[in-house]
UniProtKB/Swiss-Prot annotation:
Species name: Variovorax paradoxus (strain S110)
GO molecular function, one term: ATPase binding
NCBIfam families for this protein: clpP (TIGR00493), PRK00277.1 (NF001368), PRK12553.1 (NF009205)
Protein name in UniProt: ATP-dependent Clp protease proteolytic subunit
Database matches in PANTHER family: ATP-DEPENDENT CLP PROTEASE PROTEOLYTIC SUBUNIT
Record's keyword annotation contains Cytoplasm: yes
């Protein structure tokens, strides 16, 4: 169920704040955005990417020197949508700290590793999975060939970025991503996808 569907069912909790000027209610995600916390929950697609990118840009405009926390619980999804988030994370001035809560797979794991080095975290029972780019082209043989070349170029691009983000040799990343490669939180730390596994706030 997407966040939009949950919102449609009225299942997103509301937070009521009281001040000298009266009372104000926020949905929980808007309230957390005030604390510079962004969530990516569910599939990475154009809609979720647009929401995340907009929030990143908004928080940069609010304070370009204060970190942004990016919580990820995602099975992955669209490469182009994920790369829009990745590029924005690198483009903006604030450091983006990432945290895996639950599951970060495919593009979800890629974005987890894209956080500021030293500020990439996972909860202890989270799982992380990396693999190669998936594609499905239909149509004339010539068009399929064009798409295949593009997928191979994208695969190479993502492997190079993942090698740089993790510190692993490119050949190891290529080999490990040939098939679904599952890691525990501690294994993800050893691999370089995250920097620390956190059980409790300090």
């Amino acid at each position: 169920m997407s966040a939009q569907e949950i919102k449609g069912l009225g299942m997103i909790p509301m937070v009521i704040e009281q001040s000298g000027r009266g009372e104000r209610s926020y949905d929980i995600y808007s309230r957390l955005l005030k604390e510079r916390i962004i969530f990516l929950v569910g599939e990475v697609n154009d809609q979720t990417a647009n929401l995340v990118v907009a929030q990143l840009l908004f928080l940069e405009s609010e304070n370009p020197d204060k970190d942004i926390s990016f919580y990820i619980n995602s099975p992955g999804g669209s490469v182009s949508a994920g790369m829009a988030i990745y590029d924005t994370m690198q483009f903006i001035k604030p450091d983006v700290s990432t945290m895996c809560i639950g599951f970060a797979a495919s593009m979800g794991a890629f974005l987890l590793a894209a956080g500021e080095k030293g500020k990439r975290f996972s909860l202890p029972n989270s799982k992380i999975m990396i693999h190669q780019v998936l594609g499905g082209a239909r149509g004339q043989a010539t068009d399929i060939e064009i798409h295949a070349r593009d997928i191979l170029r994208t695969k190479d691009q993502m492997n190079r970025i993942l090698a740089e983000r993790t510190g692993q040799p490119l050949e190891k990343v290529k080999s490990d991503t040939e098939r679904d490669y599952f890691l525990t939180a501690d294994e993800a730390k050893d691999y370089g996808l995250v920097d620390q596994v956190i059980a409790k706030r300090s």
